[in-house]
Regions:
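Proline-centric
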Residues: 19-25, 109, 140-144, 207, ...
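Alpha-helical interaction/dimerization surfaces of two-component signaling modules
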Residues: 48, 67-71, 417
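Signature of N6-adenine DNA methyltransferases within the class I
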Residues: 3-18, 22, 35-66, 76, ...
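Polybasic, glycine- and aromatic-enriched phosphate-binding surface used to engage nucleic acids
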Residues: 263-264, 269-456
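Periplasmic c-type cytochrome electron-transfer domains
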Residues: 232, 236, 420-423, 498-499
Length: 508
């Protein structure tokens, strides 16, 4: 579909069946479909119950005309070719408490021109209006009657991302959430978001805030295929009170199917942000002009110039203000590499270039106090697991989160931690999307073990360094580190949570 609409039609029979079952419509009801598309939900609603009234909105005039032809003989179906988010009756009191049921697959990330953005900001001042689906969700909750039911399928990003804090609080206080089912976007034929999963939320409008906060949400995950939505036998089910969620920082849906990790996430004694600075790096404003690459075998390097030996800065003390002549220094860009990362990219560090980075409106000469320092490079976008490598006194670009421990003795210990499965599990519980921004990394709980345990971990990391330099196999050492951190986090778990004590795990 065109970017302006950004519609992904619900072509999965299993998803449609699941959503209709959760909606649980009854006869003589008034139902809203706020973004009808080709009418897949309207068809399913009519098959489920014929004695209902459906109001279907569709912005795309061609689709709206097709719907009018399709339901010409159905007097109980009205098609409205309007922008739901700007429809006058909806944004005035006329639209409030109007519908018994609402079902939708709203557009995700549809482009809004700047004039429309300004209008939406005035109407929905507390929402992140660049993301269309969340605005639909907020509006439609206000359109429900008391006791009315809503079922939406959307990306799951609103459950955790900071920009949706207001929306989460609104939902938690004004509705009782019955169920949230989370699954891969690939369940939609022809759709696969790399940045998030999809979530189907079922909720009931409720003005009683106390009842809402005492409500337990059923969160279902672990689906293998669309058919699993119709039977949760093999799925993972977690229950969490809305009151617990609203007490989380930014009211985020921080949860895990592991009850202990849930407690650790909600009541950590120490977070990464307590012991380390987490920052993003530089943006030149014009990377192809100022950055060069080692050779074109490097991923995504096709349009970059290859660095020559006489341009490299060698044996020169790093200078934040740049050098008198054109010299290039190593910069770490994105890409998931564990422990050690070779020099592949180089940034122009002449005084003239540095001045450009500082003054150009597109450039970001940010967090410069951490340039040329030792720390950890964590790619901001990762796929299956979090990774980290040593910065080794290089510069990081904006695709990297730099983690700089305030106590240097923790550098190798944290390097090991960020490459373990439990770190990935904790971060994905805080933010299930592939975006590992600095603000989320700061929230990861960490348990600092005894001195001898840290020494043992550091020794294993040094062995990995030696093996990486000769292309040796270090998988057994990684497994040992994974086991050690499982012991750190799970051994004496009652002490970790209740008494906040640190464990003497490997003390001699």
């Amino acid at each position: 579909m065109e970017k302006i609409y950004q519609q992904y039609y619900t072509k999965s029979n299993e998803i449609v069946s699941y959503m209709l079952n959760k909606l649980a419509i009854r006869e003589n009801s008034v139902i809203l479909e706020p973004c009808a598309g080709d009418g897949v939900f309207v068809d399913a609603l009519l098959q489920k119950e014929s004695n209902i009234k459906i109001e279907a909105f569709e912005l795309n005039i061609n689709e709206a005309n097709n719907l009018k032809k399709k339901y010409y003989t159905k007097p109980n179906v009205s098609i409205v070719n309007e922008d739901t988010l700007l429809y006058n009756d909806f944004i005035s009191n006329k639209g409030k408490n109007r519908y018994d049921f609402i079902i939708a697959n709203p557009p995700y990330g549809a482009w809004q021109d700047y004039d429309k953005r300004n209008i939406l900001k005035e109407i929905y001042p507390n929402l992140y209006i660049k993301e269309t689906y969340t605005t639909f969700l907020y509006l439609c909750i206000s359109l429900l009657k008391e006791g009315g039911r809503l079922v939406f399928i959307t990306p799951d990003t609103y459950l955790n991302l900071h920009m949706h804090t207001f929306l989460r609080k609104y939902i938690l206080q004004n509705t009782s959430i019955e169920e949230i089912s989370i699954f891969n976007s690939s369940f939609f034929p022809g759709v696969n978001f790399g940045y998030s999963k999809l979530a189907i939320i079922t909720l009931v409008k409720n003005r009683n805030i106390i009842n809402n906060l005492n409500n337990k949400i059923k969160i279902i995950s672990g689906f293998k295929e669309p058919a699993d939505l119709l039977s949760t036998t093999n799925a993972r089910i977690t229950y969490i009170e809305q009151n617990d969620i609203i007490q989380n920082e930014n009211h985020a849906f921080i949860y895990s199917d592991d009850e202990y990790l849930n407690d650790l996430l909600r009541f950590p004694s120490i977070r990464i942000g307590d012991i380390a600075d987490c920052v993003t790096g530089i943006y030149t404003g014009d990377d192809r002009r100022f950055i060069k690459v080692k050779d074109h075998s490097v991923k995504n390097s096709k349009n970059y110039e290859i660095i020559s030996d006489n341009e490299l800065c060698i044996n020169t003390v790093p200078d934040l203000n740049g050098y008198d002549k054109v010299l290039y220094v190593p910069i770490i860009k994105g890409g998931n590499t564990r422990y050690l990362k070779n020099d592949f990219w180089y940034i122009n560090w002449s005084k003239e270039s540095v001045q450009f980075y500082k003054t150009n409106r597109k450039s970001r000469f940010q967090n410069s106090q951490f340039y040329f320092k030792q720390g950890l490079a964590v790619p901001m976008v990762s796929s299956n697991s979090i990774t980290a490598s040593l910065i080794n006194n290089r510069i990081i670009d904006q695709s990297i989160v730099g983690v700089f421990p305030r106590n240097e003795e923790y550098i190798l210990f944290l390097l090991a931690f960020f490459n373990t499965s439990i770190c990935t599990k904790l971060l994905r519980s805080i933010n299930p999307s592939a975006n590992n921004s600095a603000n989320y990394i700061k929230k990861i709980p960490i348990i600092i073990p005894d001195y001898n345990t840290i020494v043992h971990i550091n020794t294993l990391i040094e062995i990995i360094f030696s093996l990486k330099k000769v292309d040796g196999d270090y998988t057994s050492i990684e497994k040992e580190l994974d086991n050690i951190f499982n012991v750190i986090f799970y051994e004496n778990r009652d002490k970790n949570i209740s008494k906040r004590l640190q464990n003497e795990l490997f003390a001699i």
